[in-house]
Amino acid sequence: YNPVQRKLRVYSSITLRVIEVEGDSENKLSEGSIARMTPELNDAFSRRFINSQSISSRYDYIEEHGKIVVITDPIYDVALAPFIQWKIEKGIETEVVYADDIGGINAIKNFLEDQYYNEGLTHVIIAGDEDQVPSELVSNSGGTGYCDPCYSYIEGNDSYPEFFVGRLLTHNVSEMESVVERHLDYAKNP
């Protein structure tokens, strides 16, 4: 999906060429990160990796939901309050932080890395647009765009996330109130 052009490309057939590289190319998860793996993350991995069962048979999962960090702008405090309260009522540790208090893209990435290794971070919700909470601008064959998931590429040199990242993309308080209301309606009455 290209959010700038608002186009979704669906491929019915794709050809890949695998190129072997020189040197050590293993990209293993550290033992500590596997011990923090939640059932939700294991489910995502099982859809990506053929040998994901070998990981789940060797390590126990944490029983808690993990921790959510919401990165936002202070203008959304009131609009996000019902969403934050709902997560807390569901027993999910939830912390709200402001992008301006953390700093730029690298500071946010460092903050999230620290949360991942030391606080059990499993989910990040970015609330607001790129002007309020910045994301890395990346280029690939499809063009250039913002990469929220790049915040979750902590271990190794791959593009597989260590935690989930999502964005409540809104440009003003009214839009955020609407998004939160719809989210809660669905969460409470699916």
Q: At which residue positions do the language-model features occur?
A:
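Cysteine-dependent hydrolase recognition
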Residues: 1-190
